Amino acid sequence: MKHIIYIFLLCSIFSFAQVRVVKELDSNWKFQKRKSLEAYQINFNDANWEKVNVPHDWAIYGPFDKEIDKQNVAIVQNGEEVASEKTGRTGALPHIGSAWYRNNFNIPEYETGKKVILLFEGAMSEPKVYLNGKKVGEWAYGYSYFYFDISKDIKEGENSLAVEVSNP
């Protein structure tokens, strides 16, 4: 009988367990390669922006050019005393500057008080993240995962996510 009560109690505990819900935001993104001071705003017009799915690496669009990151230096650690041409420091990425990603998504049912985490598996680089017009965080790196607690900023219904990235 003790075993039956124990199993019943375990079943009761598991029935109250929280259910984790995952919403992937890998499609329906809009993208623009340019600096914009207003792109984080909820009603920003992104109708003419390129449609992309993520993962998407904005910095590799266009031809690679070694002139972008060419240097004439002597690398002391390599024992060099005479300067010579070096390339590849940044991989000769074809775009230097800023770009934006935007995604409008729907949360059909949301209970206030639930914990909501926005997880990025990487964003190159120095992303600034906005949800519903409010900056929710930034990350100083590139191809590494990061996350923000957006529990206070998410809402039931339509939400607007904007991410500014830069390749300085």
Provide a role label for each language-model segment.
Residues A83-G88:
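Short glycine/threonine/proline-enriched tight-turn/helix- or strand-capping micro-motif at secondary-structure
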Residues V21-L25, K30-K35, G91-P168:
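Accessory beta-strand-rich segments of carbohydrate-active enzymes
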Residues M1-R20:
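Bacterial Sec-dependent N-terminal signal peptides
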Residues Y6, F14, A74-V76, L93:
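General helical structural elements
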Residues A17-V82, V136, S160-P168:
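Accessory carbohydrate-binding/adhesion or oligomerization-edge regions at the termini
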